Amino acid sequence: MSEHTTSQTQVTVTLPDGESRSFPFGTTGYDIARSIGKKLAQDALAVVINGRAQDLDSPVSEDASIEIVTFDHPLGKEIFWHSASHIMAHAIEELFPGSRFGAGPAIEQGFYYDIASSHRFTESDLHDIETRMIEIGRRAIDVRREELSRQAAIDFFSSTRKDPYKVEILEDTLKDTPTVSIYHQGEFADLCTGPHLPNTSKLKAVKLTNISASFWRGDSSRESMQRIYGIAFPSEKLLKQHLAHIEEAKKRDHRKLGAELELFMLSPEVGSGLPIWLPKGAIVRNELESFLREEQRKRGYVPVYTPHIGNIGLYKRSGHYPYYSESQFPPLTYTDDLGREEQYLLKPMNCPHHHMIYSSKLRSYRDLPIRLTEFGTVYRHEQSGELNGLIRARGFTQDDSHIYCRPDQLVDEICNAIDLTKFVFATLGFDDIQIRLSLHDPENQDKYGGTKEVWEQAEKDVREAADRMNIDYFTGIGEASFYGPKIDFIVRDAIGRKWQLGTVQVDYVMPERFDLSYIGSDGQPHRPVIIHRAPFGSMERFIGVLIEHTGGNFPLWLAPVQIAVLPITDEVHDYAVQVRDTLHAAGMRVELDTRSEKIGKKIRESEVAKIPYMVIIGQKEAAAGEVSLRRHREGDQGNMTVEELKEKLAKEINDKS
């Protein structure tokens, strides 16, 4: 048999543990899972072939690295929940004929679908839909992907499905896409890129959680729709665990704790999605910003400030407009005294402003890297149904930095940015972190700025940095920004939820668009490379997640009130004031409770306020020049002098422990 023939009949598959196996040409992901083990084949949801998530029945037609996706895989829940949204739409279509469907994505905790229906859904309908979803699961309906021309898809959704929403997407959003994919599930079908579950039997448990109003394509001037949220699992046990987590999450809800602990407020008079920081919340935010500022200073960053608005031409040049136009506030139009019209945007990104700072003077290769940093407020017109306190807001502040470097400095700078982000998360108690290399989709190159060669180089650099830092990561094809690949940090909180927070992103595109340059050692102009970097992501979202992660029990260095001084009787008032003043002079945040209340009530109220330490002072302590120390949730810590207390607390604050 010739070498050529062998290469056509066999493929070499590399598994995640590095093992290589040979399989017949055209072997599917399911075949590979079955060859590894019966249990893996039963649990398999999809397959990742050379970094791209695909349906489990996808054939392997070349040598490839392979990952079998189960529910616990980094991509597993997203794929499962996306398929569950299709099963929900299928159930609704059977129960409420004539319903039509808008968007139906997986989200951080479950899925939703936007529905156009003459039926007004109520909470009582949710149980019927859940029951029908489980029934569809029991039918074990095969899910089939069909690829067809855009025109054939338009004909299908016009005549067979009678779905004007998908026709609009095909004629508008996908007008330049020659081939599209449809997923069929019995009588149900939808326009979708996938991947999806191989059949509906994987769904064993479901809970529909909420109904809200929405609009087609998020545009309030378009048709109103109804959005149903839900979550689903491959077992009842997992659903029960999730519901228990939901109860715990309600106790930790940052909106509830934010009000109880007086951290922030939301005011309809101010506007939806525009949180206001109260004094105690401002302390938490200021401490976090100061922490990052100092760490950045040590690492060579320099601060800048930029305006809250910018000329629309700036964002057209960067591509943020019209690329993000659907999530931006409408342009502000200004006419000067001469009748000349200018348009401005509320700043959707800090990046273009920083690029203008870089380009404001001639740069030498010796000047690089230049690391600009700003806590810059940006604005996004998020849909009202998606707003969620601090975690999803319309106005928020990014800890935004841009590093301008030479190509030979790039990998080192990416490594430094990764190191800083890991340090920030470790300091704040996020120990369970997944890292995703978010790459572009080469089959949809038109979605991205820059050439194929530029993207290949950028992704090579990102992989090299991740490998050098010895971090475990998974890849997400199609998850890149339009101007570059990125490293996304996904943290798991105290009750197991995942949150995407920090990011490090490589950008070869913006230097071209903004004609950025430096003079090299050869005396000629060269393009720098940009790294976009934000460990927190946004201050609002990060603090919202931190509140829920800690349950409002902030570490001492972050707590708005660090110590409550609680005198037992009025006779020790003067000594209590001395203790308060001594701790305050040492830079600690102290409250003195002089009310004529029983000490038990004072302690209970301090516990409810989640104040880390309580200093109890009675006549015995005052006479001895001591205090009795209590720790929140831990109780009595013993007696000590004020000086010993000051040293103990100062060490804990400085260590950020």
Curated annotation (Swiss-Prot):
Any one Gene Ontology cellular component term annotated for this protein: cytoplasm
Cofactor field: Zn(2+)
Pfam families for this protein: HGTP_anticodon, TGS, tRNA-synt_2b, tRNA_SAD
UniProt entry tagged with the keyword ATP-binding: yes
Compartment(s) where it occurs, according to its Swiss-Prot or TrEMBL record: Cytoplasm
Region (Catalytic), start-end ranges: 253-555
Swiss-Prot/TrEMBL keywords: Aminoacyl-tRNA synthetase, ATP-binding, Cytoplasm, Ligase, Metal-binding, Nucleotide-binding, Protein biosynthesis, RNA-binding, tRNA-binding, Zinc
PANTHER family xref list: THREONINE--TRNA LIGASE, CHLOROPLASTIC_MITOCHONDRIAL 2 (PTHR11451:SF44), THREONINE-TRNA LIGASE (PTHR11451)
Role noted for this protein: Catalyzes the attachment of threonine to tRNA(Thr) in a two-step reaction: L-threonine is first activated by ATP to form Thr-AMP and then transferred to the acceptor end of tRNA(Thr). Also edits incorrectly charged L-seryl-tRNA(Thr).
NCBIfam families xref list: thrS
Name of the protein described by the UniProt record: Threonine--tRNA ligase
Gene name of this polypeptide: thrS
